[in-house]
Amino acid sequence: MDLFWDTSAVVPLIFDEQHTLGALQAYQKGEGFFAWDWLTIETEAALSRRKARSFQWEKWSEISKLFQWVHLPQNEWADIRKQNRNWMLRAADAAHLYAFRRVCSILPDLRLVTFDDEQISLASKKGFRLF
């Protein structure tokens, strides 16, 4: 199963928290791993802010190698901003969802892995496939 990951689903793979079980289920069922490349910055910020130990940094390093990274070039930023006028998500969440939608045009069975309530709500309303 091809999965597009949001940061809210990656961090629970590294830290034991509320969504760890769901994240592990997605991780085990995933065959293709996709994410917006900004996820690296968000995840490493989470690791730093939580004062991650060396084994957690190593775990992130291994997980990050699985991903095919989606870049959103500057010439698409206006489209993201325009789309988000309707979506009304936090900026990074809008970009994650925009990148997901873009990859869906190539991989129509792609599923979004997120534990962000606003993303889940919007994705459900828009008919995006969720894990």
Label the model's feature ranges:
Residues W69-E118, F128:
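Active-site neighborhoods of divalent-metal-dependent phosphate/nucleic-acid chemistry enzymes
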Residues M1, G30-F33, L66-Q68, I106-R111:
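Short active-site oxyanion
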Residues M1-A35, R49-E58, F128:
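Short, well-structured N-terminal submotif of metal-dependent ribonuclease cores
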Residues D37-R85:
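Active-site-proximal, substrate-binding regions of enzyme catalytic domains
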Residues S8-A9, W38, D117-E118:
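Alpha-helix/helix-capping structural signal
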